[in-house]
Amino acid sequence: MANIQLAGRAKLTPFRHIALGTWRTAYDPSIYGSLTVPMDDTLRYIEAFRAATGARLTVTHLMAKVMGAVLAGVPEVNAVLRLGRVYLRRDIAVFFQVAIEDPETGSVDLSGVRVERPHERDLVDLVREFEKSTSRVRRREDLEGLEKSRRGLLRVPGVLIGWTMRMLSLLNYGLNLDLSWAGIPRDPFGGAMVTNIGSLGLEGAFVPLVPFSRVPIIIATGAVEDAARVEDGQVVVRKVMRLFATFDHRIIDGAHAAKMVKIVKGCFADPFASFGEPKALPIATNA
C-alpha cells in the first residue's frame, strides 16, 4: 500500500513548470499573506453551540471545518510535490500542531494530530475526537503514531538528523512508500497545517513551512481581539481574528489564494449557516 493516496499528476501551467525548477526546496518558495475575519457572530455561535450540546467548541475546531472546506473547494492546492512534479491528493486531511510539555525537562515541544475530512464531520464528534487525540498526545500515549516516530528520531545523532529527515521525506513522499512497518505513520500531516498562536498570547506571526512534511499550506490563527471598524460612517468596536498564511509558491499562487480567501470569508461571515445550527443532543432513555 502506498504512503498517501494520489488522484494523479496535476497538469502544469508554464509558470508552475518554471516554479518547480526555480525553487528546489520548501525553504525558499514561501509566500505570505494575512486575512482579518470578523468574530462577533462566530463567538455567538460558539456560545450557542456550547449551551446546546455541552461540547466545548473552540475556534480551532471551526478552523478544521474551514480548512477542510478550503481543500475541498480548491482541490489544486490539496497537493504534494514529489520528484519534481505536483500530484493531487485523493484524501482531505488537516494537521493541527499541539504544544506539549516534556515531563523530564519541562521544556515546550511540538507534536500534533491529523483530522480526516473535517468539513464533512459532525461538530460534536469533531470536538470529541480533538479532545481525545490531543489528550493522548499531551500524555504521550500516542505510541502507535506520530509521537512514537518522534521519539525514535531522538536516537539519531544531531549530525545526522538533517540527512535522516530528508531521507524519510524522500522515501515517504518522493517515492510514496508506506513505512508504517518501520513505525512511521502513513501520511501523518495531510494537505494543510494549522497552529494556534493566539493561545500563546500572540496577536499574529507568520510560521515557516515544514519541508519534510511536503505540506504546502500552514495557517497560524492569531488571538481574538477588539478592533475599530467603520460601519455606515461610524467607528465601532468589533471582535476580529487575523489569520497568517504561509504557502509553497511551487504549488500555490495568487489565484489559488483568492479562491481560498473567498471560502474562509464565507465561513466566518455567517457561521450559523456555514457550520450548522447548534442542536441539543438527544437524551438517552431506557427502553
Give the positions of each predicted feature.
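C-terminal catalytic/motor cores of large multi-domain enzyme assemblies
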Residues: 1-287
